[in-house]
Structure formats: C-alpha cells, structure tokens
C-alpha cells in the first residue's frame, strides 16, 4: 500500500470490519488502517454501492482519490442480472466508475462478452469493452 507517512499511525483491525466512504460500504475479515484515508482490506472483501457488489480477496482503498483496487484469483462484480469476472478491478466510489485490465468476462443471461480491458459505469449500468472484444450468444 506504500510507505507510512511520518505522524501516521498503523492500526490492525482483526475480526469482521466495515468502512464507509462516498456511500460505498466495504466489509472484510480484517484490515490495516494506515491513515484516515488509506485502508487495506483482507479476506472476503465486499464493496457495495447501490446495486453494485464487488467481491475479492484483498482490496486497497485510497480515500484521497476515492479509489478501491480489488484483487483476487477471480474478482466478481455483480450488478443485478450481469456479472463481470476479472483479475483486478479499480472502482471509483465517488464517480461510480470501474475499470479492469488483463482480461474480463461479462455474463448476462444468455450472452457472454470478453475483452482485454473495460470500463464499467455503475450509474448507467454500461460496460465499455476495449481491445480484442468478443461476444458469444446462441442467437447470433
């Protein structure tokens, strides 16, 4: 998460932990608080804002730039009937915009959309896929 600034304290939070910023709630098994605006989350990480749910093993949150970077073997982003699977997901809790790189798969009903990179706009429920985009649907 980076160096600890002089004067900052580091607090280890063991046991179910929750934090809130910009209307997003982040829960996990344990956390390390580096400052008022920098927290690292471990184990069963869940970020929830409105209808968006982001699941991972670990997350780093920087409140100064309103960004949560979520890591896992498979990060899962669920918004109603659509689910995105990727390896790393960056979510801005103020703008409600996420992005992924390194590959992602969106599953929605009978469709499957794959791309190397993408941007997710939670307010409008839109996914913009970039770089080697492929869609699969039995009807097309």
Q: Which functions belong to the PLM regions below?
A:
Residues 1-140:
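N-terminal amphipathic/hydrophobic interface segments
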